[in-house]
């Protein structure tokens, strides 16, 4: 009986704390100035639930952002203003890994609405099954609102690599980026 009462008390306490915390977070973040980064990976690929978003939910996400006080942050502006204090509410959209489903599902929406984003690309899987091609990546990077970002070569857990292996991975990606798109992306997203 004592254990049941203690468990009930803990449950009620946690419930009340979380209710207050959520209310306090809403009050706090509604006045926040700065950048929120929202990261996506796969689109309409239900076989990968941990990294997938259904396209109707993605569209809803974009509509919520458009109707909020936040504005989309163009990656080129973000790059220039990186070290400056952020005085406006901004959303930075990022897409990791260059999956083909991004190109087929989300890219047409972002292109139509001219919504800025960063596409972080690991060079090793490009063109393989389920991934974008270099022509598709170049198309995104050549747009006014899509920016290509660096995501390593292998997309391995770089923390498990030696310093020399880490440097070789990045240098290999740099060389491929230069060959395929003509430049090395300035923005880097650490894999995992």
Model-inferred region functions:
Residues 96-97:
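Noncatalytic alpha-helical scaffolds and linker/capping helices
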Residues 33, 38-48, 87-91, 100-192:
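Metal-dependent polysaccharide deacetylase catalytic core of the NodB/CE4 family, i.e.
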Residues 5-15:
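Bacterial N-terminal signal peptides
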Residues 16-91:
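N-terminal pre-catalytic segment of deacetylase/amide-hydrolase enzymes
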């Amino acid at each position: 009986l004592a254990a049941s009462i203690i468990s009930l008390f803990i449950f009620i306490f946690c419930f009340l704390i979380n209710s207050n915390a959520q209310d306090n977070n809403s009050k706090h973040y509604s006045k926040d100035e700065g950048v929120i980064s929202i990261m996506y990976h796969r689109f309409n690929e239900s076989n990968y639930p941990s990294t997938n978003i259904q396209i109707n939910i993605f569209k809803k996400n974009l509509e919520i952002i458009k109707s909020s006080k936040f504005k989309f942050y163009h990656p080129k502006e973000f790059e220039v203003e990186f070290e400056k204090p952020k005085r406006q509410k901004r959303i930075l959209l990022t897409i990791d890994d260059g999956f083909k489903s991004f190109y087929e599902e989300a890219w047409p929406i972002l292109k139509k609405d001219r919504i800025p984003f960063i596409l972080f690309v690991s060079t090793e899987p490009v063109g393989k099954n389920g991934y974008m091609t270099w022509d598709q990546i170049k198309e995104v990077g050549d747009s006014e609102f899509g920016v290509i970002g660096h995501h390593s070569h292998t997309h391995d857990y770089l923390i498990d690599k030696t310093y020399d292996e880490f440097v070789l991975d990045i240098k290999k990606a740099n060389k491929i980026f230069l060959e395929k798109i003509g430049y090395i992306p300035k923005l880097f997203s650490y894999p995992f």
